[in-house]
Amino acid sequence: MKQILFVCTGNTCRSPMAEGIWNEWTRRWGIKGIQSGSAGLAAFPGDAPAENAVRVMAEWGIDISAHRSRALTPELLDQTDAIVCMTEEHKAALARLYPAERLFLLSHGVRDPYGGSVETYRRCADQIFDGMQELLVWLRTW
């Protein structure tokens, strides 16, 4: 079983939304063999997801309310087969710690919705979803 990790900054908006969308998308389409998680490069462990992230995911029929943020650790890196980054900056930072060929930039970069309106979070969710097919194709190449 492959393990992928969605990574953003605080692990309260983009990466938990991506994890929720990925899990729902793979469940609906019967895609097996790839588990997912999420973490943040500057996360405060135990933080709840952003209210608007929870709200927008609920609109999609996805419940991320129980999610709690976690920081990216060396142990987590060791357990991960591939890392899905939300920005070029995340990818560049991780390239110093993790094999570059196992780093993937989702949707050519996903803008941070933190502090934004519900509509900002909706656009973020759409952008994340738009990158899922490309991610799956990439994952199947290794």
Explain the meaning of each model-derived region.
Residues 1-75, 137-142:
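Conserved active-site segments centered on acidic
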Residues 82, 86-142:
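Phosphate-binding/catalytic loops
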Residues 78-79:
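Alpha-helix C-terminal capping/helix-to-coil transition sites in glycosyltransferase folds
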